Amino acid sequence: MRKFISFAVLALMASSMSAQTVANMKDLSAEKKSAAVSLKLTGTLTTTRNSDFRQLRDLAWQLRDLDLSEATCPVLPKNAFHSRHHLQHIILPNQLQEIGSQAFFACDNLQEVVIPQGVTKVGAAAFSGCKKLKTITINGAPELGEFAFANLEGVKLIKVNSKIPPKAAATAFSGINMRGVKLVMPKGSEKLYRKAAGWNAFFGEVKQAREVCNPEACLIPTPMELEVNAKATPLQVAGNWKVVAADGLANEQEHAERILKERTGGLDAYGKNARKGGNAKQGSELTMTLALDESLPDKEAYTLEIQQKGVVIKGKTATGVFYGLMTFDQLLRGDASKIGCDAIPQLVVKDQPRTHVRELMVDPCRIFIPYEDLKAFVPEMARYKLNMLHLHLVDDQAWTIEIKKYPRLTAEASSRWGMDDMLMPIKGYYTQEQMRDFVAYCAKYHIQVVPEIEMPGHEVAAISVYPELTCKGVRKPIRTTCGVSDELLCAGNEFTYEFLGNVFKELADVFPSEYIHLGGDEAGNPALDCWTTCPKCQALKKKLGITSTDRSENWKLQGYLFDRIIDLLRTQYHKTPMFWYETDFKKIQPGCVTFAWRAGLTKEALVAAVENNARILLCPGEHCYFDYPMAKGDMPEVNWGMPVTSLKATYDLDPAWGMGEDFEKNNLFGVAGTLWSECINSPERIYYQAYPRSLALAEAGWSFQKNRSWEGFL
């Protein structure tokens, strides 16, 4: 409570605080950074690691007004103010020369920007998604990158002081309502702007470029078979579309109509195209047929045929039909650098997945993900045929799922102050009703939702409310840093099993997936030592005949705890347990799914899976940890020492790990990408960390090795 009282005081102080002037962010205390609302920096600004910009972005979370006019900074770095939602006003450095890509991405309260005279380049997506940006003034003639000012819903005035139009990508102003924007330029230069790429869109004279798509260049993941008939007449996508769907495909028909509306101009209630102009005027009749075909070899298999007058998609199941639609959607989008494609060549796709589980894991415990933002994550997953969303709902830092039997868990353990050096309020949880709705929403996209409740470690949030869960029975505060706690649930205390049983009873009712994840990781050195001295744990070991004293006895005790919970989940709730594999596990309980996650220890985990006749999902850190930076110096610039997981490293993942066909047939469960959120402090940052690596993961999980090519993927 004391921490939240102090936050209220800080917020009150911040609201009345006048602009603070300092040379650099290091001149402010942590508390003043957190409370700052208005700042002026005058020094030479640092741009790497824990730079002035990283501190402005991640530590000064309440910042609304920033004056950098007197600061020395030739280059505003990439992601400088990425998704800083409070920022309203900024004065850029007078001597600025370049604005990096995504520098102000999703700063959705920013109201005005003036680009200084000396700026020569505005990077890709630099101001994309600044929804309340009303006025843009460009004093020089900088080159404007792809989507530099895209998706600005509120922009009303753009003033350019150069008589010669600045060079602009065709997509520089994509997603802007051109009719609602006043473009002001020097007298006598309108003719040049009318003809200039990027700028001509403001005059309503140039149709945005559309083209015949190149299927080989736009499909991710790569399909098993693709045959293009380049000599045949392409399908012109603008026309009067109707969708004909077999029984049982009502959901897929809705998706088909949505895709056609978004990509070709739409359908009205009678299946007629609502788009004005184009082939629709001529009354081109186009049909999309959705059907089931039981002869296909896999439950997710589909065929897609593009004909001159329509599209035929067949699937073994509704899931296969849906994935055919996702492939069609990508064909309509082309390479995504333009508004879309006018035509698709006649072709046939025959496709099915290599693995049947292609998962992403998100972590709302370290930094909470609001419900609507969590929902927004789903369509992009489905677009690339990712089909499992793993929710890490419990950890040392928060308990984020409502448990009606234990209301104190969310009342007291779902909020805290700060995450490492980010002194900000972090709070939120999901109600059971929200999760029921979320599960149903995901099902429409053929994604199943798997909840995770950690045990026996990573449970400090629960322990902070119910100290009787621990060996010493001492209340511990919620953890506000990353790392591993030395607290465990007490294996010798029957309340632990009662508590977990009640939690899983409610989860089993909310989440219909056949899988529940039990955690199980990082309960070893030194944490298991708390079981060594616990009288209850010692008594249980004696009862079980566990007599070894080389610390293996504690792993055996963890095995006992797991055995009891696994038996409960199987017999009462018909669930298949999952857990993170540790090399100290000497057995994998029959029927369970284990995760190979520790970097450098994947082979050991796979061998254990084979020896135990178990299924295993691959998410090794060196390939699949998407919270890690994608390149040196990338976000998160400050972390606990994360290595780099590059796009190439993710793409290079071989789900079979060279173990052969028998392993792939009998043991391989799937692949997963993990998004731990210790250093991810906004929903937009989740997307930044997830993509494009999730695309590489999708191809690794779906596409057969012989069809994959790094050069083709790029």
Over which residues does each language-model region extend?
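Structural signature of tandem-repeat unit edges
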Residues: 37-45, 62-75, 85-98, 107-121, ...
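Conserved, mostly hydrophobic/aromatic
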Residues: 243, 317, 360, 381, ...
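Active-site neighborhood of glycoside hydrolase catalytic domains
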Residues: 467, 479-592, 599-602, 606-607
